[in-house]
Amino acid sequence: MLEKLMGADSLQLFRSRYTLGKIYFIGFQRSILLSKSENSLNSIAKETEEGRETVTRKEGWKRRHEDGYLEMAQRHLQRSLCPWVSYLPQPYAELEEVSSHVGKVFMARNYEFLAYEASKDRRQPLERMWTCNYNQQKDQSCNHKEITSTKAE
C-alpha cells in the first residue's frame, strides 16, 4: 500500500532514513513541533507495536523532500479513505485505526443528532405524557395496553 501511495523511489528515500519495521506505522508528529519554527531540529516519532506505544526523539530533522512525501501521502489517504473527516489519527495509520476513527466520528454525529431530536420538543414533559396516556387508558378500561414511552430517558 505504501508503494502505491508514495512511489518506489520515495519509499526507498524514506526507508533509508528511518527503519519502518512492522507496518504498524511510525506516525510523525511534526506539526506540533514545527508550528512555531520551521527550522526546528527535533521531532518526535511515535511507534505503535502490538498495542504498546514508544515515543522516540529523532535528532536533526529538517524540512526536506522526505517531509513532503509524508504530507503528500497523508493528504492522499485523507482524500481516498475518508474525505469528510478533517483529522486522521496518524499520517500512515492502519486501515483498522482509520476506520475506527471514522466510526467514532459517525457515532458522535449520530449521538448529537439523536440528542438534538430528543431535546427539541420540551413543551410536553415526560411526566405529562405519562399522565395523558394513563388517563386515556383509564377511560378505555376494557383495553389494557402496556404504557410505553417513546421519549429517550
From Swiss-Prot:
Residues 1-25 are annotated as: Involved in targeting to the mitochondrion. GO terms for biological process: D-amino acid metabolic process; positive regulation of protein catabolic process. Residues 138-153 are annotated as: Interaction with DAO. It comes from the Eukaryota. Keywords: Cytoplasm, Golgi apparatus, Mitochondrion, Schizophrenia. GO terms for cellular component: cytosol; Golgi apparatus; mitochondrion; perinuclear region of cytoplasm. May suppress DAO (D-amino acid oxidase) and SOD1 activity and promote their degradation. Has conversely also been suggested to function as a DAO activator. May stimulate the degradation of DDO (D-aspartate oxidase). May play a role in mitochondrial fission. It is linked to Schizophrenia: A complex, multifactorial psychotic disorder or group of disorders characterized by disturbances in the form and content of thought (e.g. delusions, hallucinations), in mood (e.g. inappropriate affect), in sense of self and relationship to the external world (e.g. loss of ego boundaries, withdrawal), and in behavior (e.g bizarre or apparently purposeless behavior). Although it affects emotions, it is distinguished from mood disorders in which such disturbances are primary. Interacts with DAO (D-amino acid oxidase); the interaction is direct, can occur in the presence or absence of FAD or substrate bound to DAO, and results in a complex containing two DAO homodimers and two DAOA monomers. Interacts with DDO (D-aspartate oxidase); the interaction is direct. Interacts wih SOD1; the interaction is direct. Interacts with MSRB2; the interaction is direct. This is D-amino acid oxidase regulator. It comes from Homo sapiens. The gene is DAOA.
